[in-house]
């Protein structure tokens, strides 16, 4: 079972513009303690937008 203090937890990335949750990925908590933000393609908007980690 995954504990709440997992080093590489699963996170969901949501589009900043339309708020759709498009991507699921893992991140390293030691390297990225704050929220992750990546520029990825949003199929709902039809272009590359900033995607941010949701809780």
Curated annotation (Swiss-Prot):
The keyword Transmembrane does not apply. The keyword Endoplasmic reticulum does not apply. One of its GO terms (molecular function) is structural constituent of ribosome. Gene3D superfamilies: Ribosomal protein L33 (2.20.28.120). Transmembrane segments: none annotated. Disulfide bonds: none annotated. GO terms for cellular component: cytoplasm; ribonucleoprotein complex; ribosome. One of its GO terms (biological process) is translation. Keywords: Ribonucleoprotein, Ribosomal protein. It comes from the Bacteria. InterPro entries: Ribosomal_bL33, Ribosomal_bL33_CS, Ribosomal_bL33_sf, Ribosomal_zn-bd. Coiled coil: none annotated. Belongs to the bacterial ribosomal protein bL33 family. NCBIfam families: PRK00504.1, PRK00595.1, rpmG_bact. PANTHER family: 50S RIBOSOMAL PROTEIN L33, CHLOROPLASTIC (PTHR43168), LARGE RIBOSOMAL SUBUNIT PROTEIN BL33C (PTHR43168:SF2). This is Large ribosomal subunit protein bL33A. It comes from Mycobacterium tuberculosis (strain ATCC 25177 / H37Ra). The lineage of its organism: Bacteria, Bacillati, Actinomycetota, Actinomycetes, Mycobacteriales. The gene is rpmG1.
């Amino acid at each position: 079972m995954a504990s709440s203090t997992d080093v590489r937890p699963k996170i969901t990335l949501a589009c900043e513009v339309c708020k759709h949750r498009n991507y699921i990925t893992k991140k390293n908590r030691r390297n990225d303690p704050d929220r992750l933000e990546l520029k990825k393609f949003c199929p709902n908007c039809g272009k590359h937008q900033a995607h941010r980690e949701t809780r």
